[in-house]
Amino acid sequence: MRRRRRRDGFYPAPDFRHREAEDMAGVFDIDLDQPEDAGSEDELEEGGQLNESMDHGGVGPYELGMEHCEKFEISETSVNRGPEKIRPECFELLRVLGKGGYGKVFQVRKVTGANTGKIFAMKVLKKAMIVRNAKDTAHTKAERNILEEVKHPFIVDLIYAFQTGGKLYLILEYLSGGELFMQLEREGIFMEDTACFYLAEISMALGHLHQKGIIYRDLKPENIMLNHQGHVKLTDFGLCKESIHDGTVTHTFCGTIEYMAPEILMRSGHNRAVDWWSLGALMYDMLTGAPPFTGENRKKTIDKILKCKLNLPPYLTQEARDLLKKLLKRNAASRLGAGPGDAGEVQAHPFFRHINWEELLARKVEPPFKPLLQSEEDVSQFDSKFTRQTPVDSPDDSTLSESANQVFLGFTYVAPSVLESVKEKFSFEPKIRSPRRFIGSPRTPVSPVKFSPGDFWGRGASASTANPQTPVEYPMETSGIEQMDVTTSGEASAPLPIRQPNSGPYKKQAFPMISKRPEHLRMNL
């Protein structure tokens, strides 16, 4: 801005009011651009009066009445709006969803700031319990870091992370469908088309983690949640291993024994192939009612995982049997999914031949089970021994030393999506429960997995877009019949629609109606 020299030869002191006006315009988004006219550059006449020839669009500077103006109270809170400070008081405790050795998981409602009124799950961890063990500290930090890094339709979203003197808080999306474990306990076993849907979504989540250099290592029904629509969400990343890429081996002993790969138990070093063993163990659990290798105690279970032959029930289809044998190979190098194709190798197997992977990733495929929910706060899909407890977050009366707190520096996090509109609206649609719940009707009458008529073996043109590597079709192993103790006899038709069903001389076994799960893996419903 030009300054006119006074008659005494000196220039007047600069006027900063214009700069302040520009700064204020930045706050209120006011357009201060002036017409490009050299004759209107704040020229002052003698006497300090404004030149009346300035163009104001036909309206004089003082001709606007109050009816044209909006009153706005200027205060520190309205002008200097910084990022919202997240603390425990921002959330109202509603229900207890679960408990562990290091803390609790609550259902909460946000009562201040962005997302006011929205329901979340709040995981509260006690610092004093965590710092006792360096491994536990590493697991906690890994979970927070992984949840910040990974965004995927089938992985739980981290919304906030913050801490107080004695506690760590993870605010996660609330998954009202509960644990897949609950559905497995209620049903006993899943039909193959139902298991196929869940395993397909899980395989996509595992593949995404592996692309990020992350091994999940703790795949089990308890860590697989369902959202309100019935889609899968992987949770609990405390046992994940970060920064593991092709060829990298880790030796950490962790995870749930029944779903643990042999190379972890032998401490011989492991890589991402352990997740495909766990997927096979989970698949076996879904289709038979128990993990493939269980014993009376921890030692016997480990012995069976390392030495015992895999027994497959005769009622399984040939595709299911073949996939289980390829996933549950003790030699990790020859295990399906261990090659460069990773998830693409698994997804190319004929067991998944009905899956449209592009639609699955977009969550356009209808899940086989949709939770019956009465409201957004519904907790009916969670264990009642927790939900009936009074939700109380114990006082934060323990503060760690400054040196001990150093390990939790940088824990605080706010998701970039917090200021965006919620992508998915909550809806409640009454739906009849699956007929699989009624004894005597073990077969699902209509497969919920969508596929193109006549396309029984191809993965579709969309498969290559969902997976970076184009998978190759792997031939099934058809030689050899697995041994299994047959306690009952009867006929059970293949639950998965197959154009040319296998007619091998297999001795049929009825679907087990009583869960064979070990006692410590059961849930009292």
UniProtKB/Swiss-Prot annotation:
Entry keyword Thylakoid: no
GO cellular component: cell surface; cytoplasm; glutamatergic synapse; mitochondrial outer membrane; mitochondrion; neuron projection; nucleoplasm; perinuclear region of cytoplasm
Record PTM Phosphoserine, positions in chain: 394, 434, 441, 447, 452
Residue sites binding ATP per the record: 97-105, 123
Tissues with expression: Brain.
Signal peptide positions (record): none
Post-translational modification summary for this protein: Dephosphorylation by PPP1CC at Thr-412 in mitochondrion. Phosphorylation at Thr-412 is regulated by mTORC1. The phosphorylation at this site is maintained by an agonist-dependent autophosphorylation mechanism. Activated by phosphorylation at Thr-252 by PDPK1.
Phosphothreonine found at: 252, 412, 444
Result, substituting residue 29 to A: Almost complete loss of activity
Listed GO biological process terms: apoptotic process; behavioral fear response; cell migration; cellular response to dexamethasone stimulus; cellular response to growth factor stimulus; cellular response to hormone stimulus; cellular response to insulin stimulus; cellular response to nutrient
EC numbers for this chain: 2.7.11.1
Modification type N6-acetyllysine: residues: 516
Domain AGC-kinase C-terminal: 353-423
Keywords per UniProt: Acetylation, Apoptosis, ATP-binding, Cell cycle, Cytoplasm, Kinase, Membrane, Mitochondrion, Mitochondrion outer membrane, Nucleotide-binding, Phosphoprotein, Serine/threonine-protein kinase, Synapse, Synaptosome, Transferase, Translation regulation
Compartment(s): Cytoplasm; Synapse, Synaptosome; Mitochondrion outer membrane; Mitochondrion
Ranges for region Disordered: 28-54, 380-399, 486-509
Annotated effect of mutating residue 28 to A: Complete loss of activity. Abolishes interaction with RPTOR. Reduces phosphorylation. Loss of phosphorylation at T-412 and T-444
UniProt effect for mutating residue 123 to M: Loss of activity towards ribosomal protein S6
Comp. bias (Acidic residues): 30-46
Entry function: Serine/threonine-protein kinase that acts downstream of mTOR signaling in response to growth factors and nutrients to promote cell proliferation, cell growth and cell cycle progression. Regulates protein synthesis through phosphorylation of EIF4B, RPS6 and EEF2K, and contributes to cell survival by repressing the pro-apoptotic function of BAD. Under conditions of nutrient depletion, the inactive form associates with the EIF3 translation initiation complex.
Domain notes per entry: The autoinhibitory domain is believed to block phosphorylation within the AGC-kinase C-terminal domain and the activation loop.
Protein name: Ribosomal protein S6 kinase beta-1
